[in-house]
Design a protein with these regions (language model features):
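Nucleotide-activated chemistry modules centered on ATP-dependent adenylation/adenylyltransferase
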Residues: 2-401
């Protein structure tokens, strides 16, 4: 009986090689499974299916996990305004976990003996896929031909060409990972720390001049409207923001960080929707959360992003952090306006029923209604007690006159 193997199939070079090699050289019954987190068009998915069969797959399936990805991860990333190193919206990092979970589920459903993926031995994805598979289907063998054989792109292209599968893999200067939460760009100038990416490297080009106002509405921290149009489907709301923002070339940057395996890595990205949505959300929170809600939410959100990146999504503490993040959003309601311009944007204003700037006690820099001048002087004097006590004993440490 043939060994049944599920390949996490993106249609790229490494996974194409994996499908063909396992089917042709090993004689395995290969099932190509493409886990879509919102980055594939209908045409791309159709091409993936056709290519999988050309490569020798016994079966092919597209696993659409975009809605699950939003409900179980993106929602909390927005609650926490999660940006790794203050820059990167953790696009690929978070996607891979849910792709791995979907692949593992499918492998169990069809009774597979093994799971294969195309990760190399130098990046984060090998950790994310392997850890997910080890937890969800520990009885299955994990096959990684590119990693185990330390294969070069040239070797894989030559093998595919020699066996009748013609593609332009070798001509690609950059490799892209496209998803609902942004596009990552690797290769080319990325490999030289002294260089940035040229305009031509970005998939979405700035095609607008001037400026325009964008409004984003939130209900309990979740996006629910774009320019006045209400969305029940949050993924579609994200797509709407992406379309508008990308037309201005917004959301481009370069992320430099530490990989899970310990080396430094650099990646370019374009992520208009994440940058605009989280900027609007964070701005709204400044008006609607207390000082300490903001402070502690930022602390746990930083850990949430770190754990996502480090392939620890299945760690039980993540459910506890999600509960805290969700609780913090009960009063994060309202509409934020932003002004967009080529390659940038700025926040403009907030309209919220929970706006704490609007209160009956006092208006910053104008006047106090909730206390008297004597109250203010007493508050300041008591607040200075610890400092005054210290410097009474350490007058030599006071600033020079």
């Amino acid at each position: 009986m043939k060994k049944k193997v599920v390949v996490a199939f993106s249609g790229g070079l490494d996974t194409s090689y994996t499908v063909m090699y396992l089917a042709r050289e090993k004689g395995y019954e290969v099932y190509a499974a493409c886990a879509d987190t919102g980055g594939f068009s209908a045409e791309q998915l159709k091409a993936n299916e056709e290519n999988a069969y050309k490569l020798g797959a016994t079966g092919y399936v597209t696993l659409d996990v975009t809605a699950e990805y939003y409900e179980k991860s993106l929602k909390y990333m927005i609650y926490g305004n999660v940006l790794r190193n203050g820059t990167y919206p953790i696009s690929v990092s978070s996607e891979r976990i849910f792709q791995g979970i979907a692949i593992a589920r499918y492998a169990k459903e069809i009774g597979a003996d093994a799971i294969a993926h195309g990760s190399t031995g130098a990046g984060n994805d090998q950790v994310r896929f392997d850890m997910t598979f080890l937890v969800m289907c520990p009885e299955m063998e994990i096959i990684t031909l590119t990693r185990d054989g330390n294969l070069s792109r040239r070797q894989e292209v030559d093998y595919l060409n020699a066996n009748g599968f013609k593609a332009d893999f070798a001509k690609l200067k950059y490799s892209y990972n496209v998803g609902i939460w942004g596009t990552s760009i690797c290769g080319g100038e990325i490999l030289d720390s002294r260089q940035g990416l040229p305009e031509s490297a970005y998939l979405k080009q700035c095609c607008k001049t001037g400026s325009e106002i964008l409004s984003i509405g939130f209900s309990h921290g979740e996006i629910n409207s774009v320019n006045g149009k209400v969305y029940d489907d949050k993924v579609e709301a994200i797509r709407a923001v992406e379309t508008i923002g990308a037309s201005y070339g917004i959301g481009r940057d370069m992320h430099v960080g530490d990989t899970i395996i310990g080396i430094k890595g650099r990646v370019g990205f374009e992520a208009a929707a994440p940058m605009l949505i989280m900027a609007a959300h964070k701005f709204l929170e400044k008006f609607t959360l207390s000082k300490w809600q903001q402070y502690w939410k930022d602390q746990v959100a930083n850990w949430y992003g770190m754990f996502l990146h480090e392939s620890q999504y299945l760690e039980p503490v993540m459910r506890d952090i999600e509960a805290m993040l969700e609780s913090s959003q009960r009063n994060v309601n309202g509409t934020v306006t932003l002004e967009l311009r080529p390659y940038g944007f700025s926040t403009v204003g907030v309209d919220s029923p929970d706006d704490l700037v609007k209160n009956k006690l006092g208006e910053y820099g104008e006047g106090a209604k909730g206390w008297t001048s004597e109250d203010a002087k007493g508050f300041i004097k008591v607040s200075s007690t610890a400092l005054r006590a210290y410097y009474l004993n350490h007058k030599d440490e006071l600033p020079d006159d």
